[in-house]
Amino acid sequence: MICLGLVVDPKGRKASKSRGNVLDPNYLFDNFGSDAVRWYFFTSTQVGENYRTGTDTLRETVQQFFIPLWNCYSFFVTYARLDNFDPSQAQVPLNERHVLDRWLLSRLAWLVGAVGQGLEHYDAVEPARRIHRFVNDDLSNWYIRRSRRRFWKSQSDTDKAAAYQTLHQALMTVSQLLAPFAPYTADSIYRNLCGTSVHLSDWPDPPQTFDLAVETNMKLARDAVVGGLAARDSERMKVRQPLASAAIPGHPLPEEIAAIVREELNVKRLTFDAPQVQLDTTITDDLRLEGIARDIVRALQELRKKKGFEPQDRVRIRFAAPVFDQLLRAIERHTDYIQTEVLATTFEHVSQHLPLTEPDFDLIEVRGEKFPVWITRA
């Protein structure tokens, strides 16, 4: 027997016309979508408890799950179209894929098993929440964020193909798992990926991609990143500023995973078996210049966005020399890095007097110093 709670307003009061807290279902469907309403009722509370429902709670449902899911799908489609990705091409063997691919497919296999088992036991709440956590924590905030460069790079190699195949498989499988909960969203994603309805597909079996060692090491890595970022925050040290080293708890990680931790914490060297995360916060001149270069990249990325460039657009950049000596030294030493990060085919240093003759420029500010930049589509 399943007993459902009542639908009440956000303050826990029963709906009443006299209170003016009655929600019109058609209004909710029109403004948030029927899938969002369904998903809210599946995930917001345990069966038997009351559902505190309002426009704010449904808006949060859309923002916290459907937008991140659609962003993952949109990211894949954007780059798959640019590279003419063909899902029918030969699959890259699992043992030849990047550790992030192997980790995500292991997490996906676990998710398929957990969701299927939960539904077989008439539990819809925890399976839906597991899908939510997978999409947000594993797929969006870790796999795609850590793999962006693999999709961005211009050369089409085995690693890029493996990234496409992994993300394609994850989106297809998530759509199948999502179908009983959010049928319209699931069908839209699945149909656009393979041309048929998700509701005509078989329920997925857990893929044989479990890798306990990779999952265990990746969890240690992610925990270390959380601790390291907290340590940076307590030291008021921006992540863009490189540091010489960090010591983290736990056993030594495989190099392919340790490299991820170094990049996330922006440190040059990583040691292990520390009682807690410890950072070397001594800033040498070389580290300072590299940090300035990263600040320049951020300013240029914001300018790209402001000017309406797409993520894949190549650009030409000219800049007038800043007065601040360290800025100019950072640019000269890290030109290749800056160019690569902002997809600039050219990065040209021009005369300070050019703004007088070519006024169509933008000012960017880096560490309190402003200087003019010209950016055009290549």
PLM regions and their residue ranges:
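Non-catalytic, structured segments within soluble enzyme domains
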Residues: 39-40
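Structured mid-domain segments that build the active-site/substrate or prosthetic-cofactor binding neighborhood
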Residues: 43
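Short, solvent-exposed helix-loop connector elements
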Residues: 49-58
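Feature 926 captures the class I aminoacyl-tRNA synthetase adenylation module centered on the KMSKS loop
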Residues: 3-30, 34, 58-378
